[in-house]
Curated annotation (Swiss-Prot):
It comes from the Eukaryota. The modification Phosphoserine is found at S132, S220, S224, S228, S276, S295. This is Mitoguardin 2. It is found in: Mitochondrion outer membrane. The keyword Nucleotide-binding does not apply.
Length: 593
């Protein structure tokens, strides 16, 4: 063999010579006598020649590809070390993603038409304040970390190239999502600025007679531009902002405001209190100053028990006494609603809660107020069921049974034990009706089970099937809870009977595919929450004394009920009575007030 000739030759030449000498080796080994007996046809000779030639070509190609692979492995680490200190660019970009997220949530941009007070996530009000990040993109971060002198001028293009080369993994998808949200928030800022500039231009562009006399050319130019076009552009821009806010609500944390209520009041021309007008004026003035938000935050954080950095807007003797009770730990509470009701701190919420409890206790001592609150609850739920095209007959029967049970003095002790087992700290109207029943129901609707969402989001199922499945799920849950009751025929059992009629309607309204019913339920929830927020606002109600607070709460309740019942198309609860006068014995009656 000719394997000895490989010294001083390349591997390819040695392999070619070896393959070429195979026929000679076979001929010399087996002798000419063996090959002389073979009779090869011309076709067989061609096949053998083609096979030998293909084998040689395949061996050469495999060897050449193997050499190229080795060169790539050697060049890869050298290129990575020359660019960013032996750290590949995709890794740096992946490490920068968390910082971008922090930047997105570090600032807030306030809408020029509303304020951010509310923290409910289920209300379909327009979100005025959005988390907006820095105006710099990820490409600027790459430029900062680059040591090349030309990186500053070509950073954005290099970043785009690197983004295209990054494989579509979970990390890159997350970074692309963050970049998209960042750009979307920047677009929101630009649209908000355009809207505010347009509003300022409309407000200050009205020409006066003096201006027209002094500058007739400019006056004619201002009048030449059609006013309708500017208004149409402003309306389109505002509609675009509203749609963008709703889109951002679906993919991020929301901070809904009470702008829906203010717009409704402006449309219906309902009277506003002096406190709400003053708050609105303060909000409009604060839009021109970015420092006002931070200064207000510092003032709120500095509020402590027994210390008042700034004097209150009005005297609040009852509130100050309640703060002392909170300091002593004598105000129990089941759930803190500090953020939901817009309170400055937990101590502020507890002090106002104590005053509200006392105010409701005084209100419910009068027969007329008992009739009013009982009838408002009946008419609100009846209006909701009517809007949902459901018969309220079953609800009215269960509601009457629950009221008759709650008004019997012999049931109050059992009711107290049942509610204390559920964590209710005080037997008051606020703790039982507003907090335990309404607020807990809204919280449950904000976090529905995944199985329910899967059914409601299935596009292949009809709306009637979804509604039936949701109602069946609600009934099965209530039936299972009824089996675990401590008192089989107590207050909670009667409440479950009412919930069997109301829960499916509310659940399908908040979670279902019908936009009209969803709007009605969202408005209902928004009105209830705003009613509680106004009740816990020192500027809307008087905390000077318990009777004054009770009077303001009653007026606030009448005003909110008129708005809500008017929207639902239900009659206002003014002169319709309950099932008879309440007993006025001392002791047990106070437990339910």
């Amino acid at each position: 063999m000719a394997f000895r000739r490989t010294e001083g030759m390349s591997m390819i030449q040695a392999l070619a010579m070896t393959v070429a000498e195979i026929p000679v080796f076979l001929y010399t080994t087996f002798g000419q006598s063996a090959f002389s007996q073979l009779r090869l046809t011309p076709g067989l000779r061609k096949v053998l020649f083609a096979t030998a030639l293909g084998t040689v070509a395949l061996a050469l190609a495999a060897h050449q590809l193997k050499r190229r692979r080795r060169k790539k492995k050697q060049v890869g680490p050298e290129m990575g070390g020359e660019q960013l200190g032996t750290v590949p660019m995709p890794i740096l970009m992946a490490r920068k993603v968390p910082s971008v997220k922090k930047g997105c949530s570090s600032r807030r941009v306030q809408s020029p038409s509303s304020k951010s007070n509310d923290t409910l996530s289920g209300i379909s009000s327009i979100e005025p304040s959005k988390h907006s990040g820095s105006s710099h993109s990820l490409a600027s971060m790459v430029v900062v970390n680059s040591s090349s002198p030309t990186a500053a001028c070509s950073g954005s293009w290099e970043a785009r190239g690197m983004e295209e080369s990054v494989p579509t993994t979970d990390g890159s998808a997350e970074s692309l999502y963050v970049q998209g949200m960042e750009l979307f928030e920047e677009a929101l800022q630009k649209w908000e600025q355009a809207l505010s500039v347009g509003q300022r231009g409309d407000g200050g562009s009205t020409p006066t007679p003096g201006d027209s006399l002094q500058n007739p050319d400019t006056a004619s130019e201002a009048l030449s531009e059609p006013e309708s076009q500017r208004r149409e552009f402003a309306e389109k821009l505002e509609s675009l902002l509203h749609r963008a806010y709703h889109l951002q609500e679906e993919f991020g944390s929301t901070f809904p405001s009470d702008s829906m209520l203010l717009d409704l009041e402006r449309t219906l021309m309902l009277p506003l209190t002096e406190g709400s007008l003053r708050l609105r004026a303060d909000d409009e003035d604060s839009l021109t100053s970015e420092d006002s938000f931070f200064s207000a935050t510092e003032i709120f954080e500095s509020l402590q028990i027994g210390e008042y950095p700034l004097p209150l807007s009005r005297p609040a003797a009852a509130y100050e006494e309640a703060l002392q009770l909170v300091k002593e730990g004598r105000v129990p509470c089941r759930t803190l609603r500090t953020e939901l009701l817009g309170c400055y701190s937990d101590q502020d919420f507890l002090a106002k809660l104590h005053c509200v409890r006392q105010a409701f206790e005084g209100l419910l001592e009068e027969r007329s107020n008992q009739i009013f609150f009982g009838e408002v609850g009946r008419q609100m739920v009846t209006g909701l069921m009517t809007k949902a095209e459901k018969s309220p007959k079953g609800f009215l029967e269960s509601y009457e049974e629950m009221l008759s049970y709650a008004l019997r003095p012999e049931t109050w002790a059992t009711t107290r034990l049942e509610l204390e087992g559920r964590g209710v700290a005080c037997m008051s109207f606020f703790d039982i009706v507003l907090d335990f029943i309404l607020m807990d129901a809204f919280e449950d609707l904000e976090n529905p089970p995944s199985s329910v969402l899967a059914v409601l989001r299935n596009r292949w199922l009809s709306d009637s099937f979804k509604e039936t499945a949701l109602a069946t799920a609600c009934w099965s849950v209530l039936k299972a809870k009824r089996r675990l009751l401590m008192v089989p025929d107590g207050f909670i059992s009667h409440f479950y009977s009412v919930s069997e009629h109301v829960s499916p309607v509310l659940a399908f309204g908040f979670l279902g595919p019908k936009p009209q019913l969803s709007e009605v339920c969202a408005f209902f929830k928004h009105q209830i929450v705003q009613y509680l927020r106004d009740m816990f606002d020192l500027d809307n109600v008087r905390y000077t004394s318990v009777p004054a607070l009770a009077e303001d709460i009653l007026q606030l309740s009448r005003r909110r009920s008129e708005i809500l019942l008017g929207y639902l198309g239900a009659p206002v609860a003014s002169s319709i009575g309950l099932n008879g006068p309440l007993p006025r014995e001392n002791g047990p009656l106070e437990e339910l007030q």
